[in-house]
């Protein structure tokens, strides 16, 4: 029954993407016959001789052929956390035909991302990222090797270094000032009614990242094409592919229109990048003075011959694709979750606002340098990232060779997920792990930059998020200004604050708040 439900859901999703509906009528019986044959064959199959000799980690019971796919549910990070409580912090599963390791503790996460990072630092090559990110020539999804090392070096030293983060300060300052102005206007027009704060945060975050990458504002894009297409790309990166889990059924992805749909999204971005690169090359030839953005920097690197390989235009596009996806989504997602938590915790809200306003003083505005003195704000941000890591299941890694982990045998080519959601809510490490308690960090120096494995919202090791400094700088500055310039409350007020805000999630590459965030702002006068 679980098998039929799974395929029915996937097939219906595929139907929405495919324009060949008449062909699909004939495809359904063929699909059913294929499933029946494969199901019958695998029921009688036994584990390989090699696997019988290995000491594999504990595994939940799995179904023939689909393995443990049916146990993932709508929120895999939550389902896998629940399973790990029964089967342990190192758990072996099968997602279709793919052997998969789930890591759910800080100790084992450290082993994967530090002690044996060189073994686990590659990426499995899957359908959607390969198509959408130029056949694995980006940074996030590229397999480990010389190409990845070179492009990551470009990213760390040229694009997202601390020096570059400071260079783009002007974009953050100008866009946050505009955000404050928009909130004031919306508040005045609403006359005490709630405003859609989430919508404003999305716009501001995307404006900052677009100005840094393109030299243009997000709002300059006609018909909101950029925002909608980026959102769809984010959704499809995590979409289901038959070929990824059942290699013999890869043809179904083509037949149901899935591959064509992914390529249509890729083509839209590819045309956009072509136009963007041509515009930047033309501007460089004119020689007019202007602020350099990330496209300019990449074109300079492409032309200076400093790399051990040719940085092609496709390589440049792949890196830009990473920047958009990683930069635009995580900042506003974190800000929305944090304001949601604060609105339900007025004591914490008051305490952090008092600190922000005390540090900024009578100057009448917040400077980025002030944030270093806002210790409690840092605690609040850490606690928010602990409860709501942008990607609760870190991007999958892949074992490049046979390896031991926690006393168990892990075969080469095993896919590895570190469940940051489970690690950061581990009751063995955190007191009252499901509660929002920023004070836990006042006497705890645990950081989120990948050195402390109890808190890994951005990963760690060679695969730590290279844009961490950029994203954190943007989020901190946005939040400090919102807390300085406005008092905030929930629309309905009342004593049962936790019941007035829907904290439901939407799962994807990053986990968003399902319902829009509406809050009531009251302007503050220094």
UniProtKB/Swiss-Prot annotation:
**GO molecular function annotations of the record:** heme binding; iron ion binding; monooxygenase activity; oxidoreductase activity, acting on paired donors, with incorporation or reduction of molecular oxygen
Q: Name one GO cellular component term.
A: membrane
Name the UniProt key words of this record, in alphabetical order. Heme, Iron, Membrane, Metal-binding, Monooxygenase, Oxidoreductase, Transmembrane, Transmembrane helix
- Ligand binding (heme): 465
Could you tell me what reaction this enzyme catalyses?
(E)-phenylacetaldehyde oxime + reduced [NADPH--hemoprotein reductase] + O2 = (R)-mandelonitrile + oxidized [NADPH--hemoprotein reductase] + 2 H2O + H(+); phenylacetonitrile + reduced [NADPH--hemoprotein reductase] + O2 = (R)-mandelonitrile + oxidized [NADPH--hemoprotein reductase] + H2O + H(+)
- What main location does UniProt list? membrane
Which top-rank group of organisms is this from?
A: Eukaryota
Q: Tell me, what does this protein do in biology?
A: Involved in L-phenylalanine-derived cyanogenic glycoside biosynthesis, including prunasin and amygdalin defensive agents. Catalyzes the conversion of phenylacetaldoxime (PAOx) and phenylacetonitrile (PAN) into mandelonitrile (MAN). To a lower extent, can convert various aromatic aldoximes and nitriles; mediates the transformation of 4-hydroxyphenylacetaldoxime, 4-hydroxyphenylacetonitrile, indole-3-acetal-doxime and indole-3-acetonitrile into the corresponding hydroxynitriles, but cannot use the aliphatic compounds 2-methylpropanaloxime and 2-methylpropanenitrile as substrates.
- Put simply, this protein is called Phenylacetaldehyde oxime monooxygenase CYP71AN24
The taxonomy runs: Eukaryota, Viridiplantae, Streptophyta, Embryophyta, Tracheophyta
